[in-house]
A protein has these predicted regions:
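Core beta-strand-centered patch of the WYL/Sm-like small regulatory domain
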Residues: 1-65, 70-75
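Polybasic (Lys/Arg-rich)
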Residues: 58-151
């Protein structure tokens, strides 16, 4: 059995997710279509300090595939042809900064996860992690591991 204090519903990758506080896992996500046997209890909802200040719309954009984790500032560089994709993912208010004639940079908070790396890898050489170096190095290591499978 799970007990969760609900905070928000978000739409991600064709599914609704409940963002909630779990006694076991803290801030977590549950895919709504996978829920069964729900019960409303008389237990008071847990409202953490984190939840009181969290912008759930922004949070939903930072999380890829609803993987939990700590959000961190990530600076990315894309070819101009991907501007529409970035705006679709992060919203029309995303600030795209020109970087030469063929690229732009974009800085945002992202929960770094395998799903984020997979999304980025799909763009091949048209996208690059610029900062932080730890995220850049982890992505490069993931790419090397995958490449080893094909040698």
């Amino acid at each position: 059995d799970y007990f969760a204090s609900p905070y928000a519903l978000v739409w991600d990758n064709e599914n609704y997710y409940l963002i909630a506080h779990s006694e076991r896992h803290g801030l977590t996500h549950y895919r709504v279509d996978k829920m069964a046997k729900l019960t409303i209890t008389q237990k008071p909802r847990v409202m953490t300090e984190e939840a009181k200040t969290l912008d759930f719309t922004r949070y939903g954009k930072a999380v890829f595939g609803m993987f939990s984790g700590q959000a961190q500032q990530v600076k990315l560089r894309f070819q101009n042809s991907l501007a529409g994709v970035v705006l679709d993912r992060f919203g029309k208010d995303a600030m795209l900064v020109p970087d030469g004639n063929e690229h732009f940079t974009f800085t945002t908070e992202i929960v770094v996860s395998p799903v984020f790396y997979g999304w980025l890898a799909g763009f091949g050489e048209r996208a690059e992690i610029l900062f932080p170096e730890s995220v850049r190095a982890e992505f490069a290591a993931q790419c090397r591991k995958t490449l080893e499978l094909y040698k």
